[in-house]
Amino acid sequence: MGLLQGLLRVRKLLLVVCVPLLLLPLPVLHPSSEASCAYVLIVTAVYWVSEAVPLGAAALVPAFLYPFFGVLRSNEVAAEYFKNTTLLLVGVICVAAAVEKWNLHKRIALRMVLMAGAKPGMLLLCFMCCTTLLSMWLSNTSTTAMVMPIVEAVLQELVSAEDEQLVAGNSNTEEAEPISLDVKNSQPSLELIFVNEESNADLTTLMHNENLNGVPSITNPIKTANQHQGKKQHPSQEKPQVLTPSPRKQKLNRKYRSHHDQMICKCLSLSISYSATIGGLTTIIGTSTSLIFLEHFNNQYPAAEVVNFGTWFLFSFPISLIMLVVSWFWMHWLFLGCNFKETCSLSKKKKTKREQLSEKRIQEEYEKLGDISYPEMVTGFFFILMTVLWFTREPGFVPGWDSFFEKKGYRTDATVSVFLGFLLFLIPAKKPCFGKKNDGENQEHSLGTEPIITWKDFQKTMPWEIVILVGGGYALASGSKSSGLSTWIGNQMLSLSSLPPWAVTLLACILVSIVTEFVSNPATITIFLPILCSLSETLHINPLYTLIPVTMCISFAVMLPVGNPPNAIVFSYGHCQIKDMVKAGLGVNVIGLVIVMVAINTWGVSLFHLDTYPAWARVSNITDQA
């Protein structure tokens, strides 16, 4: 028993050492480029799947093994780690950092909640719409971490009252008391502590528990007091921090007034994770999965100019919209029942006392933000401007602004995002007051030299691990192509040629949907993209017909807490159990799979010309064989 425990403690080290040694006969006994490339690919994939080393570190394996085995030169491998998509991500993160710093996302979220009211059905729809909207532009993890504190505050208001009469009798007392997490109370609730931007606590540093599949297991989200109380700040600079009791105390102390209250908490919590996933599908920059697909596709088929921000949005927006509505019905039916008339009524006469109190609390939180600030207006303007420039660069149906330049093809979506992101480092955060003196303010503050975002803000938000991970995927794909491994894999799949194209795509989608529940999304798509490209070329199927649905289905890792970080964040709040996630997530998975398959076979065909085998795929196939 002691030996077994010792092996379990060092299992990661054993994997790191034993896997390369056990696979070493492959390139030694078969000294070919294909075998050497397969060796590197398998070692890297095992490291990714097992989490024996961090995902970013495992992505560096091709950087030294490819040159060592003579698959690619060192400078060729290095070039794969920084691509056009990396610059696109840099620019987007600059805008995202500004949104998070000045709490523009919170203003949008609270405003939408105020519009919906406190009826469970409308509240569910509102939070799902809000999360989807934010997740289009911010990472799914960041969006979930931003919205969940607001959801938790609303939930605690909904479950803290015993009944209407009790709330009515003690309304003055309840309004005077702050929401706290005093363990002595019979009903623990959420405490919102606002910490200024200089606080060192952030989601990354707090997710320090043992990782499962690259997803941190959160047992105690952000729990930091303001260390800089002497510095006065605009309310929009404050960040909502959440204190939750430990899982054991949650089990003992969290009580729901009724089964209905418990179902509301489960429903709202899970819906945040699902709607973040749905929103991430909508834009090409919504998830790292889409970015990896875009860069791999552009590298594999450089002559194909069919996928950009505009075309992806035109295809995916109807999918997200339909998924959002159907998922709302599914979650409502599963947890709240079919009484839509009662739970979705907007009539003020039908609102209970505690629903009115909840709305009042949300109104108070919104009023704390004050009037919209100058940095918020600048950030919102840049946000809208970036989206408009992306859409109008090459809309497809009319000439875009890129056609005004003499040289074509030099500008991409990354050009726009990096330019606007660069400007955010220059524009002052304080509105210029020309010809006016700011008496009573210190000289540094009155000069207004602090920009909208600083490099420190950018560093806190930039996901460098994803950048290296994506680069490792490009390196693997490049090695597979140059060594001929992709062609060999494609030839082994000729047995699938008897199946119709839609069946091949469906099987691929089901396969990745299962794998991605246990393997991280970036690792899954990085492994499958080269294989599916070879499969499509071998079967003479338009590669987009397979790649786009698979890319979307990889994002549907919604059944387990380890599926993706949003699931882990939601699960950490303690409202739902794994069986709840599996039951609800299975329905969302099926909904997404059906809608994606319908979309790719209807408007996807006309948008991407999927009914023909394109010339750019033939050119790539000839190049691989050569």
UniProtKB/Swiss-Prot annotation:
* CDD domains (alphabetical): SLC13_permease
> Its topology with respect to the membrane?
Multi-pass membrane protein
Q: Please state where this protein is localized.
A: Membrane
Keyword rRNA-binding applies: no
Q: Which GO terms describe its biological process?
A: sulfate transmembrane transport; transmembrane transport
Reactions the enzyme catalyzes: sulfate(out) + 3 Na(+)(out) = sulfate(in) + 3 Na(+)(in)
**From start to end residue, where is composition biased (Polar residues)?**
217-228
Task: Report keywords, A-Z.
Answer: Ion transport, Membrane, Sodium, Sodium transport, Symport, Transmembrane, Transmembrane helix, Transport
Tissue expression pattern = Highly expressed in placenta and testis with intermediate levels in brain and lower levels in heart, thymus and liver.
Q: What does this protein do?
A: Sodium:sulfate symporter that mediates sulfate reabsorption in the high endothelial venules (HEV).
Q: Which PANTHER family match?
A: SOLUTE CARRIER FAMILY 13 MEMBER, SOLUTE CARRIER FAMILY 13 MEMBER 4
Please give the family membership noted in the entry. Belongs to the SLC13A/DASS transporter (TC 2.A.47) family. NADC subfamily.
Know the name of this protein?
Solute carrier family 13 member 4
| Organism ancestry | Eukaryota, Metazoa, Chordata, Craniata, Vertebrata
